[in-house]
Amino acid sequence: MSKTPLLDTIRTPDDLRKLRIDQVQQVADELRQETIDAVSVTGGHFGAGLGVVELTTAIHYVFDTPRDRLIWDVGHQAYPHKILTGRRDRIRTLRTAGGLSGFTKRTESDYDPFGAAHSSTSISAGLGMAVARDLAGGTNNVIAVIGDGSISAGMAYEAMNNAGAMNSRLIVILNDNNMSIAPPVGAMSAYLSRLYSGKTYRSLREAGKQIGKHLPKLIADRAARAEEYSRGFMMGGGTLFEELGFYYVGPIDGHNLDHLLPILQNVRDAETGPFLIHVVTQKGKGYAPAEAASDKYHAVVKFDIATGTQAKAKSNAPSYQNVFGQSLVKEAAKDDKVVGITAAMPSGTGIDIFEKAFPDRTFDVGIAEQHAVTFAAGLATEGFKPFCAIYSTFLQRGYDQIVHDVAIQSLPVRFAIDRAGLVGADGATHAGSFDNAYLGCLPNFVIMAASDEAELVHMVATQVAINDRPSAVRYPRGEGRGVEMPDVGVPLEIGKGRVIRQGNKVALLSFGTRLAECEKAAEELATLGLSTTVADARFMKPLDVDLVIKLANEHEILITIEEGSIGGFGSHVMQTLSDHGKLDGEVKMRAMVLPDVFLDHDTPAAMYAAAGLDAKAIVKKVFEALGKEHAAETVKLA
């Protein structure tokens, strides 16, 4: 007998809406169990999805999705949404090759009107859809669901300020799962929320506003303030949103369908807006291990449902993020000017390690990359040595600040760029594909890439020593190569690479951790009679011009390899060769970069193979440059 009999009858939300209202709770309970079971098989973001099971069910029951547009901010919490919207049969393919995305994705379903993965975009996108509806004479609803972490970012407030000024009929649901704004206050809160979302109250409020326009300004202002304070006193937490022009409803218990359903129905039927519904939920709701340790169950690998034990693979080498964190601790122990900054990702970047040693010198600024960069710039003006540790994909959000506030002023902000290159299961939205290109075009920037974990130690020490300009070191997600680690970092000579293996026919110049694949390729090429030099560039800016020219002069073929897009390291090498007249027939130059597409999720190894950046592809590229036939399937590499 099925454990999910009602859920089994639901193919789309149309089926859900055919059920009686007293059956909705059972659907939610079964949906939670299905979510737990699915993620135990696939891994993925877990706690946030469990926290919005009732909210997801209620939204799809009350609103006419997909005609009514439903936007999930970030998308971590969208797994239950996917199950209810025709994707249950594929839910156990989450984040695997050819399977469902771990986030919302427009090309995946009509029920995903806007793709997500980075935070704080939902209100802006929702407002755009609401305005488009109004211009087209439509009547559908637009609902944006955003978490209390995401709503802290500046973009969310920019959007709310705009929406409030336009009086747009937009519904924003604030999913407060950290109790960071205000807790629900029981039955009275639920009753007042239902009252304030109802038509009678809104009509009276609008009438009051119209009367206020004809009163003397002092009296009108005091009346408005009295109404605002009375609501703030009774409801707790809504004053800011009211100031931005929203009707504030809440806080309400996001796990109580008796509270959620009537409020959503009231708001659905409203003719005015915008609304902000403040819903309080619990991460990991309904699964005891996740409720007890929400941080450990935010994102999980495969796990045993009965025990909660996650099937984590045994580590063979330290992770790059931990090497960075530990290296920064050692440098800070010698230099009290070193500080660490992260934008809501302390454990993901290794800043949590630094925080344990130096809590007073650690700053988590929240989801605020723009602020993080300029905050670091301010610290640098006063002689401090800020390390701004941000994922490559998120650093994009602070690009103007990098240019205007850091680079133009030559301020020595140190950027630790984690998750550089392809990241695997999180796919295109989280890939660190572009930082070589978007930083490489900036004057007076030192840009490094660690080829292994030992090199990262030295590059952190190098950054500490750079006091006259900004610097960046990029490194990938995951474990290092298992190389011997230095006790302390030693600053590298700026702008100088190193030769790993000497040959005379082919030169492979690597920037970053593709060095290991270059070494594999060199071994294979040697068995095929091609003497191959392997070099580690270390620096993209300033580039080791002497090394580049030497490689070009002494080899028939020069190939660059990087874990980045077009416009990055290879482009800098080609510009140097062009400047020195080395592209006039003297050397066959090839640049191996990520393909000019957004790659879908898979394992990192599979993604690099698909991108043509593994050892097999390097060997093939060499023979293509030589003009000799060499079928890819004959290349046998370990």
From Swiss-Prot:
UniProt xrefs under PROSITE patterns: TRANSKETOLASE_1, TRANSKETOLASE_2
Annotated positions binding Mg(2+): D148, N177
Cofactor(s) needed for function: Mg(2+); thiamine diphosphate
Pfam short name (any one): Transket_pyr
GO terms, molecular function: 1-deoxy-D-xylulose-5-phosphate synthase activity; magnesium ion binding; thiamine pyrophosphate binding
Alphabetized SUPFAM superfamilies for the sequence: Thiamin diphosphate-binding fold (THDP-binding) (SSF52518), TK C-terminal domain-like (SSF52922)
Keyword field contains Magnesium: yes
BP term (GO), one: 1-deoxy-D-xylulose 5-phosphate biosynthetic process
Binding-site residues, thiamine diphosphate: H76, A117, H118, S119, G149, S150, N177, Y287, E369
Cofactor stoichiometry and binding remark: Binds 1 Mg(2+) ion per subunit.
Top EC class of this enzyme: transferase
Pathway in which this enzyme or protein is active: Metabolic intermediate biosynthesis; 1-deoxy-D-xylulose 5-phosphate biosynthesis; 1-deoxy-D-xylulose 5-phosphate from D-glyceraldehyde 3-phosphate and pyruvate: step 1/1
Reaction(s) this enzyme catalyzes, per UniProt: D-glyceraldehyde 3-phosphate + pyruvate + H(+) = 1-deoxy-D-xylulose 5-phosphate + CO2
EC number of this enzyme: 2.2.1.7
Keywords, alphabetical: Isoprene biosynthesis, Magnesium, Metal-binding, Thiamine biosynthesis, Thiamine pyrophosphate, Transferase
Keyword Magnesium among UniProt keywords: yes
Family that this chain belongs to: Belongs to the transketolase family. DXPS subfamily.
Its biological purpose: Catalyzes the acyloin condensation reaction between C atoms 2 and 3 of pyruvate and glyceraldehyde 3-phosphate to yield 1-deoxy-D-xylulose-5-phosphate (DXP).
HAMAP family the UniProt entry points to: DXP_synth (MF_00315)
Subunit structure: Homodimer.
Protein name: 1-deoxy-D-xylulose-5-phosphate synthase
Organism the protein comes from: Rhodopseudomonas palustris (strain HaA2)
Gene: dxs
